[in-house]
Amino acid sequence: GFSLFFFTSFSFVFAQNSINHFLKPADSLNRSRRNVAVVAESALSVGALVSLNQLWYADYPQSDFHFINDNGEWLQMDKAGHVFSSYQLGRFSKELFQWCGMSQKNQLLYGSTFGFAFLTAVELMDGYSSQWGASVGDVAANASGTALYVSQELLWGEQRIVPKFSFHTTAYASARPDILGNSWNEQIIKDYNGQTYWLSFNCHSFIKKSSIPNWLNLAFGYGAEGMITGNAELVNTIFLPESQRHRQF
């Protein structure tokens, strides 16, 4: 019994140490890790674009590439989503390349800009869809998310201001499930009424010598409700007569 306990404990500690060693960022460029990271990130990107095509574009015909001006739609909730997505994708990719042991310069150059590059591909898909179109506002929001990450790395060497996201289901989705989503996994992307985007400020990081705990953050949120369509003038009161579009801070 003792031998089994000792062997089990030793195996657990060894496995834990192996995992910790594997997860620890390399001190210098680890080519095998880099190759794995590039292949994995490429495969995930292609898979995500294929899935997005099925979820978002498959039901609508293709068109010639075109631009639209959607800056006034959805009370800019879609633009907040672009900022968040670009930031988080860039953050994930930068940390992945840090794990590979890439230089700080290359981490920022190839990692942090991944979010912008991926979302530019999505924008191209928008541009060829008859239902949507490429948006300069979306591209600007994507660039803003990337800039938020890169600027903090260059200025402070850490992320003190982090975009965050929360979601709850709403009654609006059932009014237009084709636009706002049929299921929870569709609504979390499509139903802007249930989304909230936050800018979370880590208090301790701004006052290093204070007794403020590291976990304490001050967050400012933005959301909107009452949206059945992108533009207020397109709302058909048959969908939801009591619908009143409004912002929430």
PLM regions and their residue ranges:
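N-terminal targeting leaders of membrane proteins
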Residues: 4-7, 11-79, 83-90, 94-102, ...
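Short loop/turn motifs that connect adjacent beta-strands in outer-membrane beta-barrel proteins
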Residues: 29-34, 98-110, 151-160, 205-216
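Transmembrane beta-strands of outer-membrane beta-barrel proteins
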Residues: 114, 118, 161-163, 214-220
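Interfacial helix-loop-helix junctions of multi-pass membrane proteins
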Residues: 122-143
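Residues on the lipid-exposed face of transmembrane beta-strands in outer-membrane beta-barrel proteins
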Residues: 147-148, 197-203
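Transmembrane beta-strands of outer-membrane beta-barrel pores
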Residues: 167-171, 222-228
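Outer-membrane beta-barrel translocator domains and adjoining extracellular loop/strand segments
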Residues: 176-178, 231-237
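Residues that define the transmembrane beta-barrel architecture of outer-membrane proteins
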Residues: 191-197, 214, 245-249
